[in-house]
Amino acid sequence: MAGFFQQVTEYTRNAISAGKYLLQGLAVTFDHMGRRPITVQYPYEKLIPSERYRGRIHYEFDKCIACEVCVRVCPINLPVVDWVMNKETKKKELRNYSIDFGVCIFCGNCVEYCPTNCLSMTEEYELAAFDRHSLNFDNVALGRLPTSVTTDPSVKSLREFAYLPEKVFDPHEVLPTEPRAGKLPEEVLDWMKAETTDKKVMESSSNNFKEGDKP
């Protein structure tokens, strides 16, 4: 009889332990159900790149003076600059300019050291191709401006992944009912413009007040 009660007690203890572990697992599941989504449904949704994002290089042919500074500062001597010397003007004439993005490491040295600012980094990062030779962009392909994520009608940009509110270090701490994590870049610009306008109004009013005090 004592053995029977011992078996019942052990079975009950095991059942309670199993239920506790089951509830712990469900608690983790329910905790993640209330969190904000992190996964991006690419390519239907895209994150907005940062302001200084180093994407595909944009090239302006008319500004280039064929100085080849970009070639000298490139860690792998990647840009190919084809030019000839004009004997009449004694100046370089640019014929062709190309960059192979299959080899480029996007360090941004060429953009930083260009004396005429003919090179700039764009927000374009979709450079996948079936043929690696198609990644060798000439001056015509480099001159095309990319389509911005914020203006592309076929893409829903995730604007809620902007700046976090003050004193918030974890995006999951933001309530799910809130539409986004922080201010949008457009709202930040509007706030800066409004602040600049207020400063100008205050300065003009102070100047008028000083002029009124003069005899």
UniProtKB/Swiss-Prot annotation:
Annotated residues for binding of [4Fe-4S] cluster 1: 64, 67, 70, 114
Topology in the lipid bilayer: Peripheral membrane protein
Entry-linked Gene3D superfamilies: 3.30.70.3270
UniProt keyword list: 4Fe-4S, Iron, Iron-sulfur, Membrane, Metal-binding, NAD, NADP, Plastoquinone, Quinone, Repeat, Thylakoid, Translocase
Compartments reported by the entry: Cellular thylakoid membrane
EC number: 7.1.1.-
GO biological process assignments: photosynthesis, light reaction
Residues that hold [4Fe-4S] cluster 2 according to the record: 74, 104, 107, 110
GO cellular component: plasma membrane-derived thylakoid membrane
One GO molecular-function entry: quinone binding
Enzyme class: translocase
UniProt keyword 4Fe-4S, yes or no: yes
UniProt remark on cofactor binding: Binds 2 [4Fe-4S] clusters per subunit.
Major localisation: membrane
Disulfide bonds: none
Cofactors: [4Fe-4S] cluster
Signal peptide: none
Limits of the 4Fe-4S ferredoxin-type domain: 55-84, 95-124
The family this protein is said to belong to: Belongs to the complex I 23 kDa subunit family.
Function as written in the Swiss-Prot or TrEMBL entry: NDH-1 shuttles electrons from an unknown electron donor, via FMN and iron-sulfur (Fe-S) centers, to quinones in the respiratory and/or the photosynthetic chain. The immediate electron acceptor for the enzyme in this species is believed to be plastoquinone. Couples the redox reaction to proton translocation, and thus conserves the redox energy in a proton gradient.
Self-association and partners: NDH-1 is composed of at least 11 different subunits.
UniProt name for this protein: NAD(P)H-quinone oxidoreductase subunit I
Name of the coding gene: ndhI
